[in-house]
Amino acid sequence: MDFNILYSFVSNKTFTDVEIVLIDEINRVNMNVHKAVLASSSQYFLNLFTKFSETNKSTITIRVRDSQISSDIICSFYGQIVDSTNYPDWKYTLLKYQCLDYFSLDYNIDILTGLKIPSEGFDLLLETANTIGYRNEINKLIAKNIPDNYDLSIFSDEFLGSLRKYICKHNIITANFKSINIYDVITGNKLSSLSLNNNFSHVCKVGKNIIAIVYYCADKIFLFDLVSRDVIDTLHNLDIQSSCDMTAICYIKSLNHLVTANSNNQLIVWDLTTRQIIKIKKVNRLINRLIANHTIITDYNLFISIGYNESILVWDKNYTISKGIDSPNKITTYSASGRELILANARYIKIFDIDEGKILYKTNNDTFRTPYDIINICDNSYILFDSDNEPICYLIYDWKNVSKIRLNRSKKNYDNIFCKKFPPESVNYSANDTNSNILIVVTDYHTVYAQINGKKYGPFVVKPNNIAGVFFVKDKKATNLLNSINDLIKHN
């Protein structure tokens, strides 16, 4: 069938046998159409033409929510894609779903979850929800688009309670070499994207909504505001000749300091409050990684630097070395308590007490596979991965009960409740905050999983692919909304 010819019969009133008059509060649309086409496309029209008083009428008037969109829908029965309005996309979509529901037509409710609705359209969203029914997808959309300072008291406690599960205080940020992208952790929808001028070598979160970015072959550190999506400052010092070849970067939250290392074996400390360099230290080895201690604040255990063969230096608040650990490790990370280091290679796994300066526990790595990464998945639980990002073993280490059980290990044992929610597949990048019980995991360089306060989000695929880093940021609006909802429910 040639739908274009069929549609021309409508324009030319050829073989038409009924006139449909669509009326809304403002507009009126007249269409000469074919009963057979409408009845075969919609149960509503089949019933209208066969079961009611309109059966033998040549002109039928129908009162609809929007006459123009309703006419577009009837045109779609003739294989046409028509938009006869000048509405913004969000308005057209909401009204279209009301009209589709009125005509008893099927629609894909998932499309709604990606809509961004301005404050002036929120009442239309609620109207649409009342028309097509409150369901998970609609509730997600409502939760995401509630305007600031909206009067939440119009909602019942039951409905407010149902909205809470669709509101998350955090968003996910992915770095893709040339772009920074922010995603809604619940829906997986991209909220915003920031294009970069060049590929970056390092990216680090340095505040609630600030990230530091170092480009390849650049001698500057750019501070980006994720809210304004703009460079708010540039850190640069002409006296540091090798700063263009930075090898590592970390953020000391308690002091608001940014620590960088470069190929000239220098450790450089920036005060982000004054945007000035406050310390330049010469070290006798190339630093490959810097890891900040975000769990506890001590004068002597601020962060660690890791050099060749995982040789470790522990740094104090004056940026002097408080301890050195020379051990042939392949991977190193802080424990959940921040008081110990977990060290591992192809032969063993060790727990090193930083305060005491000694090994608390050592066990053989009888997988004989060299670990290349370790992820603190929650509290005192860890997964070690090999060079192919495949899991090697699963660790439980509880520093509070170290005298009773120091280390439990079983190869490929993923029966922990957390791990049940994440497939034990290849992991490329992760970000966590054990204090806030947050973990984000990236697999296959594009698939994101998250767990926040024990609740699973994802998986969802992000674009562009080839994620080079991942972290999370608090959503101020969502946090305020949750607080308002909780206060209302508490006082009702």
Swiss-Prot record:
Q: Where are the WD repeats?
A: 241-281, 286-325
User: What sections of the sequence does the record tag as coiled-coil?
Assistant: none
What InterPro entries does the entry give?
Answer: BTB/POZ_dom (IPR000210), SKP1/BTB/POZ_sf (IPR011333), WD40/YVTN_repeat-like_dom_sf (IPR015943), WD40_repeat_dom_sf (IPR036322)
The answer to whether keyword Cytoplasm applies is: no
Q: Which residue intervals define the domain BTB in the entry?
A: 16-86
Keywords, alphabetical:
Repeat, WD repeat
- What's this protein's family per the entry? Belongs to the mimivirus BTB/WD family.
Q: What is this protein called?
A: Putative BTB/POZ domain and WD-repeat protein R786
Organism source for this protein?
Answer: Acanthamoeba polyphaga mimivirus
